[in-house]
A protein has these predicted regions:
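Short, well-ordered helical secondary-structure segments
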Residues: 4, 46, 83, 90, ...
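Residue-identity detector for glutamine
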Residues: 11, 21, 29, 86, ...
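Short, charge-rich amphipathic segments
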Residues: 33-53, 83-97, 122-132
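Charged, surface-exposed helical/loop "interaction arms" that form contiguous linear patches used
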Residues: 51, 60-113
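Electropositive, glycine-dotted interaction segments
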Residues: 1-81
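Switch/communication elements of ASCE P-loop NTPase nucleotide-binding domains
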Residues: 102-208
């Protein structure tokens, strides 16, 4: 039995979520293994309160952004900055920044993909991206719609943008055959603009 391409795309994204979670766990283990040694390093200085607060606020903002796609792991946010714990907390905040950086590129890809699809207004539907299903589409009542029940145009739109955002790399050559197939005319101009923008960012060639 042939699996619809839209379902394969969703499964692929689900696997990417799992891969990034494994990367985060591996990076966390690597960093945590040297925590005591680095804490005892006399050359490591603590941040002043202003620096610490700035870093903490930036970390909180990143965590809130990541929550949208379920990327945020269990994190304890320091409450206060007591003098006797300044070095420990300074090291902790640095470590959390390094751990969360594992998700940076993937989060940006998710955000771009989400934005591109959402801008196309999928006939009173919205797209959700998460680690459980990869891609989920729901209607205005938040009822889930099977991906293979979307119109052919909507499926093609999701597939094309997924390949654009997650498959091509810098200096790649991307060939797109009949992009107008089943797509609403109103989507085409914006889609071409998005493709040109991505080609410029990645310095790649797109042949349509």
């Amino acid at each position: 039995m042939n699996v619809p391409e839209i379902n394969l795309i969703a499964q692929n994204l689900k696997e990417l979520f799992a891969e990034k979670q494994r990367d985060f766990a591996s990076k966390s283990q690597e960093i945590d293994a040297t925590f005591i040694k680095r804490l005892m390093d006399t050359e490591k200085k603590a941040y002043c309160k202003e620096e610490f607060d700035a870093k903490l606020n930036k970390l909180k903002e990143k965590i809130e952004n990541f929550k949208k796609y379920g990327l945020t792991p269990s994190i304890v946010i320091p409450n206060g900055y007591p003098e006797e714990l300044q070095k420990v907390l300074s090291l902790y905040i640095d470590d959390m920044e390094a751990k969360m950086a594992v998700f940076d590129v993937f989060y940006n890809q998710l955000a771009v993909f989400d934005s591109m699809i959402s801008d196309k207004a999928l006939s009173n539907k919205k797209i959700l991206l998460n680690d459980n299903n990869g891609i989920v589409v729901v209607n205005d009542n938040d009822d889930r719609i099977p991906l293979n029940k979307l119109s052919s145009g909507e499926q093609n739109l999701i597939i094309l943008y997924y390949k654009l955002v997650f498959s091509i790399r810098k200096n790649d050559l991307l060939l797109i055959d009949e992009p107008e197939n089943s797509l609403h005319a109103a989507w085409l101009t914006k889609m071409l603009d998005d493709y040109l923008d991505m080609a410029d960012r990645l310095q790649c060639q797109i042949i349509i």
